[in-house]
Amino acid sequence: RPSFCNLPVKPGPCNGFFSAFYYSQKTNKCHSFTYGGCRGNANRFSTIEECRRTCVG
C-alpha cells in the first residue's frame, strides 16, 4: 500500500461540498467524507472502488 494511504483524512479549508473517499489505517477500510475542494492530501479518492484498489488491496 502506498504511504499516502496512511495520511489522516483532510477535508481542507475551502467551502465546497465534494463527495470523496479516504482510507482509514485504523479500520483498514475506505470511508466517505466531504472534501472542501482545496488543500487536501493524497489520501482522497473519487470512488470507493479506487480507494479500495489503491489502499486496501
Swiss-Prot record:
It is found in: Secreted. Gene3D superfamilies: Pancreatic trypsin inhibitor Kunitz domain (4.10.410.10). InterPro entries: Kunitz_BPTI (IPR002223), Kunitz_BPTI_sf (IPR036880), Prtase_inh_Kunz-CS (IPR020901), TFPI/VKTCI-like (IPR050098). Expressed by the venom gland. Disulfide bonds join C5-C55, C14-C38, C30-C51. Residues 5-55 form the BPTI/Kunitz inhibitor domain. SMART domains: KU. Keywords: Disulfide bond, G-protein coupled receptor impairing toxin, Secreted, Toxin. GO terms for cellular component: extracellular space. It comes from the Eukaryota. GO terms for molecular function: serine-type endopeptidase inhibitor activity; toxin activity. Interacts with vasopressin V2 receptor (V2R/AVPR2), probably in a selective manner. Inhibits vasopressin binding human V2R in the nanomolar range (Ki=8.16 nM), and also moderately inhibits vasopressin-induced cAMP production (IC(50)=224 nM). In vivo, intraperitoneal injection of this protein into rats increases diuresis by 5.5-fold, without any loss of electrolytes. Belongs to the venom Kunitz-type family. Exploits its two major loops and engages more positions in its interaction with V2R. The pharmacophore defined by numerous amino acids positioned in loop 1 (9 to 18) and loop 2 (34, 39 and 44) may be at the origin of the absolute selectivity of this protein for V2R. PANTHER family: BOOPHILIN-H2, KUNITZ-TYPE PROTEASE INHIBITOR-RELATED. This is Mambaquaretin-2. It comes from Dendroaspis viridis (Western green mamba).
